[in-house]
Amino acid sequence: VIEPRCADPAGTIGFFLCHGGQRLRGAAIEAPRLEARRLLAHVLNTSEEALLRDPRAPVPADQAQQFAALLARRVAHEPFAYLTGRVGFWTLDVEVSPATLIPRADSETLVEAALEACPDKGAALHVLDLGTGTGALLLAVLSELSAASGVGVDLKPEAAALAARNAARLGLAGRARFLAGDWAVALAGRFDLILCNPPYIESAAIAGLMPEVARHEPASALDGGADGLDAYRRIIADLPRLLAARGVAVLELGAGQQAAVEALGRAAGLTPEACRADLGGVPRALVLCAA
């Protein structure tokens, strides 16, 4: 297929937007023109609106090279957030890296469920985020609960370090600390609120995911074992010793997992209190309560 020529002269903003959009369209990227615009705005450290105001403005050679390099990575289906190193989550701008799962809008449902379960926004709650990754869940909750403090745990030291950087950049380092560890193995004490977005995809299903996910995001954050429930079994077994009296745990679910995870909770002596659906109508945030 011969791509149509670009109307703007080579080396200009308009040319790079046109050429980038064509390359991304050829790679079956879903919103090629939008992504080309966002990528060039990132490289030039400007707004998308500013790009469109002056499409014949020249792009400096070093930034043109940077754009070409990032474009090639996106054509290879590397996630957009890994190219820019940032993603929006809740009201926060969060740093991401290939060591972490990219926070999704679906996971904001956990924040909503947690805030609903903890209506006193001034309470000095102790919060735990298991498998914290970027720290997005914990930091989003702390940004809304002004007197709360928390701990985030991740198996990967580089993820825990990244989460700590996010806390510092967002002004939350005084109320959040991050540790490398195997789920809750090394933790003691009790928590009023526990958050967790565990790996919950069945092992056999991972190869069939979008290439951005299957090829690039960490398998340890995706693979939930043969039935997708391995992480839930480990986490829920620990919840009774970790939850304070009347404490709540909010767990992210995969599609179709609500009944199985509720059963695991009941078997551990916990009460399924609520399950909040995401914007697509999928039951996504399960709330389990301690006695």
Which sequence ranges carry the predicted segments?
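Mobile active-site "lid"/loop adjacent to the S-adenosyl-L-methionine
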Residues: 200-231
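Non-catalytic nucleic-acid substrate-recognition regions in nucleic-acid-modifying enzymes
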Residues: 1-35
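Conserved Class I SAM-dependent methyltransferase catalytic core
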Residues: 226-289
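Conserved SAM/SAH cofactor-binding pocket of Class I
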Residues: 105, 109-208
